Design a protein with these regions (language model features):
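Hydrophobic alpha-helical segments
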Residues: 9, 22-23, 92, 220-222
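A residue-level signal for conserved active-site and pocket-lining positions in enzyme catalytic cores
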Residues: 56, 95, 223
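Hydrophobic alpha-helical segments, especially transmembrane helices
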Residues: 23, 58, 88-89, 100
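Residue-level signature of transmembrane alpha-helical entry/exit and packing/kink sites
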Residues: 3-7, 84-92
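Alpha-helical transmembrane spans of integral membrane proteins, capturing the lipid-embedded, hydrophobic core
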Residues: 8-15, 92, 96, 100, ...
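Small-residue-rich helix-interface/hinge motifs
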Residues: 2-75
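PDZ peptide-recognition modules
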Residues: 71-86, 98-254
C-alpha cells in the first residue's frame, strides 16, 4: 500500500511539473492563465494574483493550467487561440521540456556523490580476436558508436548490441582523436575449460575518476539515454518488434 501511495505521489509530481512548464511558458508569451492548480479535487487553498487564481487541491494526483481560450473561443487578445503559431508551439512543448529538465536535475543530484565512472574504452581483446592491430581494434580504443547509435555509457554497448543482433555490428571507435569505422562479426572461442562460446571478442569498460565536470557530463549522458530508450521503444512498437502487450499504463507500472 505504501508503494502504491508513493507511486501515485510521484505521478502527481510529474504531472504538476509538466503543467508548471505550460504555465511558465504561457505567462512568458503573454497568454492569460485563469487558474493554475496543484492537485485535483476540492480546494484546500486558493489565492488570486492578477488574472490568475492559484489553487492547492486535496488529491495529489497532478494539476492543471487553465488558459483563456484553451477549450473555447474567446475575444480576449491574450487567449491561447489568438496567439501566433510559434507561441502556441512554445507553450505546447514547455510541459515536456520541464519534465526533461526535472529528470536532468534529479540525475545530477544522484551523481553528485559519484567517485568514478565507467568508460567505453576497450581494455582487452581475446588472444584469438581476428581483427587486432591498426586495421582492427586495439586496447585503448574508445567505442563511439554501434550500428549508427551514439555510445555514451558502458551500459549503452550491451543495449545497442542486443537490438536485433544478427551476429555482425558496425562499430565506430575513437583512436588518437580520430573516428575509425570497423565491422565486427561474432566468432567462436574456447574458454579455459575447453567449452566453445560465441562472442565478439573484446572487453570494454575503463574507469575514470569523477570530477565536477565529469559528473555533469555523465548526468547529461544518462538523461539522454533515458530519452533514447523511449525513442527506441516507440520504434520497436511501430515496427512490430514489440507489441502493445509489452506496454504498461500507470496502473501496470504501479
Amino acid at each position: 500500500m505504501v508503494y502504491i501511495l508513493i507511486a501515485i505521489l510521484i505521478f502527481g509530481v510529474l504531472i504538476a511539473v509538466h503543467e508548471l512548464g505550460h504555465f511558465l511558458a504561457a505567462k512568458a508569451c503573454g497568454v492569460r492563465v485563469n487558474e493554475f492548480s496543484i492537485g485535483m479535487g476540492p480546494q484546500l487553498f486558493h489565492k488570486t494574483k492578477g488574472d490568475t487564481e492559484y489553487s492547492l487541491r486535496l488529491l495529489p494526483i497532478g494539476g492543471y493550467c487553465a488558459m483563456e481560450g484553451e477549450d473555447e473561443d474567446s475575444d480576449d487578445d491574450r487567449a491561447l487561440g489568438r496567439q501566433v503559431w510559434w507561441k502556441k508551439f512554445i507553450i505546447f512543448v514547455a510541459g515536456a521540456f520541464m519534465n526533461f529538465l526535472t529528470g536532468l536535475i534529479i540525475v545530477i543530484c544522484l551523481y553528485a556523490g559519484a567517485q568514478a565512472f565507467y568508460t567505453t574504452e576497450i581494455v582487452e581483446l581475446n588472444p584469438d580476436f581476428p581483427q587486432q592491430g591498426e586495421d582492427g581494434l586495439m586496447p585503448g580504443d574508445t567505442i563511439y558508436a554501434i550500428n549508427g547509435e551514439r555510445i555514451y555509457l558502458k551500459s549503452d554497448v550491451s543495449l545497442i548490441m542486443g537490438l536485433g543482433d544478427t551476429g555482425t555490428i558496425d562499430m565506430t571507435v575513437l583512436r588518437d582523436g580520430k573516428k575509425l569505422d570497423r565491422t565486427l562479426t561474432r566468432q567462436v572461442y574456447t574458454d579455459e575449460n575447453g567449452k566453445e562460446y560465441e562472442a565478439y571478442g573484446f572487453t570494454y569498460g575503463g574507469i575514470v575518476e569523477a570530477t565536477p565536470l565529469l559528473r555533469l557530463q555523465y548526468s547529461w549522458y544518462q538523461t539522454m539515454d533515458y530519452v533514447r530508450i523511449v525513442r527506441l521503444s516507440l520504434q520497436m512498437l511501430l515496427s512490430g518488434a514489440a507489441g502493445v502487450n509489452d506496454l504498461s499504463g500507470p496502473v501496470g507500472i504501479v
